[in-house]
């Protein structure tokens, strides 16, 4: 039987021990901060990136991994005897990473199936972890692809931002529907769906977030949940408040992690994401 390996990109928010245990390959995006280039994989320490962003003269710029890095990654895996590679990447609404991955696979002439997760962060982790567990257990390529698609179709990702400033500066505001860019200091909750960020609610103060969450949970209380994760940018207190509210509906463990530099660059401080995978 062949060996299948899972590749993803560093926009994923995942526990380091899971990457190691499941032998997941993470290809890093890059972040430019005041003319200094950082590999995203070197900015994973809690609070490290945010302190750099706060001290920077201008908004950091993120860039997708070079095509050559993907080609090299795939060539190295093939040299190790890997017979199939499944590459799961963040939504093309957020980055051109998926196209770089496809081009790298072509250059390497490697057996790579490149998938659009439709998401990023821990919502992408749901797919990556399941695929890696299945690969380790000896599942076939088709079984893994079917499982990933099923998870994708049952996942929802919601982002709350405390300011639209970074989205405007980073040029992402054009990809957010239904938002006036002049309202920089409103709290906004958006859904990432079908590779588009769609505004759900706008308001002042953190009550905007908790009110939205309470309404969402009540409306969906009849749907059995497979897993929930929360990510945050900066201070964890709001994420922990949201976790407490979710716990009333879901009595299993909830992963709460700081999101990475790629997401923080665009959302700014005080943002969060709630990601739900339904059964």
Curated annotation (Swiss-Prot):
Keyword Methyltransferase: no
Domain DegV: 4-278
GO molecular function: lipid binding
Keyword rRNA-binding among record annotations: no
Alphabetized UniProt keyword annotations: Lipid-binding
Signal peptide limits: none
TM helices/strands, residue ranges: none
Sequence positions that bind heptadecanoate: 62, 95
SUPFAM superfamilies assigned: DAK1/DegV-like (SSF82549)
InterPro entries in UniProt: DegV, DegV_C, DegV_domain_contain
Highest taxon listed in the record's lineage: Bacteria
SS bonds (residue pairs): none
Protein task: Binds long-chain fatty acids, such as palmitate, and may play a role in lipid transport or fatty acid metabolism.
Subunit structure: Monomer.
Name of protein: DegV domain-containing protein SPy_1493/M5005_Spy1226
């Amino acid at each position: 039987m062949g060996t299948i390996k899972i590749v993803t990109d560093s926009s994923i928010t995942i526990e380091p021990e899971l990457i190691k245990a499941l032998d997941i390959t993470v290809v890093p995006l890059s972040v430019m901060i005041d003319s200094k280039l950082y590999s995203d994989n070197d900015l994973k320490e809690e609070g490290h990136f945010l302190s750099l962003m706060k001290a920077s003269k201008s908004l950091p710029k993120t860039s997708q991994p070079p095509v050559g890095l993907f080609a090299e990654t795939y060539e190295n895996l093939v040299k190790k005897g890997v017979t199939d590679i499944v590459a799961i990447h963040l939504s093309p609404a957020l980055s051109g990473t998926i196209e770089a991955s496809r081009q790298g696979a072509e250059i390497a002439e490697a057996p790579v199936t490149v998938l659009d997760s439709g998401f990023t962060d821990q919502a992408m982790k749901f797919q990556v972890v399941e695929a890696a567990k299945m690969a380790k257990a000896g599942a076939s390529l088709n079984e893994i692809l079917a499982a990933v698609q099923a998870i994708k179709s049952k996942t929802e990702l919601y982002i709350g931002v405390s300011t639209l400033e970074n989205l405007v500066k980073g040029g992402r505001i054009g990809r957010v529907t239904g938002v006036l860019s002049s309202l920089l200091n409103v709290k906004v909750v958006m859904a990432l769906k079908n590779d588009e960020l769609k505004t759900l609610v706008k308001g002042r103060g953190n009550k905007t977030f908790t009110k939205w969450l309470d309404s969402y949970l009540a409306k969906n209380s009849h749907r059995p949940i497979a897993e929930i994760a929360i990510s945050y940018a900066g201070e964890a207190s709001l994420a922990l408040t949201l976790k407490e509210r979710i716990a009333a509906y879901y009595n299993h463990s909830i992963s709460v992690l700081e999101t990475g530099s790629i997401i923080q660059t665009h959302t700014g401080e005080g943002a969060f994401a709630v990601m739900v995978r339904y059964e």
